[in-house]
UniProtKB/Swiss-Prot annotation:
Record organism: Naja kaouthia (Monocled cobra)
Swiss-Prot/TrEMBL keywords: Acetylcholine receptor inhibiting toxin, Disulfide bond, Ion channel impairing toxin, Neurotoxin, Postsynaptic neurotoxin, Secreted, Toxin
Function: Binds to muscle nicotinic acetylcholine receptor (nAChR) and inhibit acetylcholine from binding to the receptor, thereby impairing neuromuscular transmission.
Disulfide feature: C3-C24, C17-C41, C43-C54, C55-C60
Subcellular location: Secreted
Tissue: Expressed by the venom gland.
One Gene Ontology term of the molecular function aspect: ion channel regulator activity
GO cellular component terms attached to this protein's record: extracellular region
Main location as per UniProt: secreted
Entries under CDD domains matching the protein: TFP_snake_toxin
Feature: compositional bias, Polar residues: 1-16
Protein name: Short neurotoxin 1
Family: Belongs to the three-finger toxin family. Short-chain subfamily. Type I alpha-neurotoxin sub-subfamily.
């Protein structure tokens, strides 16, 4: 599986996920600088107030 891994509004980059990982994620939250976005492999659990979208196809988390 190949997932995007750039932060916020950086130029898109991707990474190959290891260990048979089958999910990509896109996590979004707001702090004092505005909205922040994190992307990567897996589907982590998040705290209240953090939006997360998980998906299962190559580069689906942009």
């Amino acid at each position: 599986l190949e997932c995007h891994n750039q932060q916020s509004i950086q130029t898109p980059t991707t990474t190959g996920c290891s260990g048979g990982e089958t999910n990509c994620y896109k996590k979004r939250w707001r702090d004092h600088r505005g909205y922040r976005t994190e992307r990567g492999c897996g589907c982590p659990s998040v705290k209240n107030g953090i939006e997360i979208n998980c998906c299962t196809t190559d580069r689906c988390n942009n």
